[in-house]
Amino acid sequence: HLLKFNKMIKFETRKNAIPFYAFYGCYCGWGGRXXXXXXXXXCCFVHDCCYGKXXXXXXXWDLYRYSLKSGYLTCGKGTWCEEQICECDRVAAECLRRSLSTYKYGYMFYPDSRCRGPSETC
């Protein structure tokens, strides 16, 4: 599903997830810690929390269906887990689009060592 998430991000932001979001700030990409540094990093934090809620179904790697309808991403029918993961990805991609005006290139490839302070809680 990471490829599908990348396609959603590309559709919403016109940017490829790699390199623009895969290592952005303290929460985009694998894992996350400390405080979310920018609006785009907050989208990634919420996405991580969303995946955490759906992880009980061990669904993080489930393939899902989605389509574009009238310029909007729409998740298709599938198992409960597939639908949940699709919604997590769809909401995050839309959040990244809304935060485009605050995107900071200085947070691309942000080193984990600079992620300080208390971690956010879901």
Curated annotation (Swiss-Prot):
This enzyme's EC code(s): 3.1.1.4
Catalytic activity: a 1,2-diacyl-sn-glycero-3-phosphocholine + H2O = a 1-acyl-sn-glycero-3-phosphocholine + a fatty acid + H(+)
GO BP term, pick one: phospholipid metabolic process
Protein name listed in UniProt: Basic phospholipase A2 LmTX-I
Required cofactor names: Ca(2+)
Oligomeric form and interacting partners: Monomer.
pH-linked activity: Optimum pH is 8.0.
Disulfide bond entries: 26-115, 28-44, 43-95, 49-122, 50-88, 75-86
Role summary: Snake venom phospholipase A2 (PLA2) that displays neurotoxic and myotoxic activities. Induces inflammatory edema by mechanisms involving mast cell activation and arachidonic acid metabolites. Increases plasma creatine kinase activity. PLA2 catalyzes the calcium-dependent hydrolysis of the 2-acyl groups in 3-sn-phosphoglycerides.
Superkingdom: Eukaryota
